[in-house]
Amino acid sequence: MKIAIVGTGYVGLVTGTCFAEIGVDVTCVDTNSEKIEALKKGIIPIYENGLEEMVIRNTKAGRLKFTTSLESCLDDVEVVFSAVGTPPDEDGSADLSYVLAVARTIGQNMKKYKLVVTKSTVPVGTACKVRNAIQEELDKRGAKIEFDVASNPEFLKEGNAVNDFMSPDRVVIGVESERAEKLMTKLYKPFMLNNFRVIFMDIPSAEMTKYAANSMLATRISFMNDIANLCELVGADVNMVRSGIGSDTRIGRKFVCPGIGYGGSCFPKDVKALIKTAELSGYKMRVLHAVEEVNEKQKSILFEKLQKHFNNDLEGKTIAIWGLAFKPETDDMREAPALVLIDELLKAGCKVRAYDPAAMNECRRRIGESIYYATDMYDAALDADALMLVTEWKEFRLPSWAVIKKTMEQPLVLDGRNIYDKKEMEEQGFIYHCIGK
C-alpha cells in the first residue's frame, strides 16, 4: 500500500515513519526544502526517542521517501494524510489555511480516486471544508473524479510518540463511505491483528474526539492544581490527596499530578480552539474557561513563592532553573511554563542560569542570550540564590545535594513538580518549597 503524508512536523514525521516501519510505502511531503534534504540524510528536526534510527532504517529500506512536491507522488498513492500545522489565530480559533491549501493542491492535480485523511487536530466541520476545497478545484478543471475525506486524529505524547503510534490505546477513524472504511481498515490491519482497538465513527465525532480528549486532560491538570493551592491554605498534603483519589478506579492515577501548569503544542491550543468552536455555535464552555484561568495563574506560582521568600526584593538575585521544555523527553517549548517564569524573573531584575538536557538550542532560538545557558545542572546552580525545578527530567531526580549546597549562594529550592521529599531536603539543610503542601 502506498500513501503520502503532507507535513513533516511532529505528527507527520512520526506517522509516516511508523507506517513505513510496518511495511507501508510512504512518501513524506514538505514545502521546506532544507528540512527535506536533511531528512533524506537522516537528520530529523525534532527530539523524539527512537525516531531518528527508525527514519534512517526505513529510508535505507526504500519504504520512506521525502519530497517537496505533492504533485510528483500523487498519482502513485491511494491515501493522502494531511498533517500540516493548525496554529491558533488571534481569537483562539484554529488556522486552517495550510489544511485547505493541501486540499486545493490535491484537487488541482488528482487524476483518479483518492482518500484524503486529516491527521492534524482540527475543529468539527473541517472535513466538509476540505471536501468543498477539493471539489471546487475539480469543478474548475471540469474533472469528474471520485474522492473521499476522512478524519484520523493523532493521540501521540511527545517523548513517547513512536511507542504510542506502534502500541496505541485506540485508533479513531471518522469516515463517510464504505470505500473509505475499507481503505483505512486495510491500512490499519496490522494493528487490528495485534488486537489494538480501532474505532470507526462519523467524521464530526472523530474531529470532536481529539479536542474533547485533550480538553479533558487539561481539565484534570487544572483541577489538581486548584486542589493543590487549596491544600497549602488548609494544611493538607496534595500528594496524600492525589494518592487517595488516584486509588479510586473511577478516577485513576494519570494526570492528577500538581505542578506549574500545562504547556506544549496541544493542550493550550486545543482548549482555546474548543472554546472558540463553542462560541461560534452560540455556547459557552464554562469549565474550559476556568481551566485556562487556573493554568495561566499556575505558571506564575513558583515566581510568587520566590517573591514571598525574598519579601519582593529580587533585584540582582541569581536564580537557577532546571528544565526548559514543557515536559521531559522533548525539546518543545511551545507555551512552556519556563518561558513565563524566565520573563517574570528578568523583569524583576534577576540573573537566570538555566539548564535543560534537550531544549537549550530551542530556548536560545526563542529568547536569545538574555539568560546564561549552563553546561549542566551543577553549573546552573553556581552562586544561585535559589534553584527552581521546572521540568522533571530523570537526571534531576537524584543530584548530589551536598555539591549543590556548596555551589549555591543560598540553599533555597523551589520544586515545581514535587519530585523531591520535603523532609529529606530539610534534613540536608535546604529551605524547600513545593506545590500543594
Where are these regions (language model features)?
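Structural/interface elements that position substrates and couple domains in central-metabolism enzymes
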Residues: M1-K437
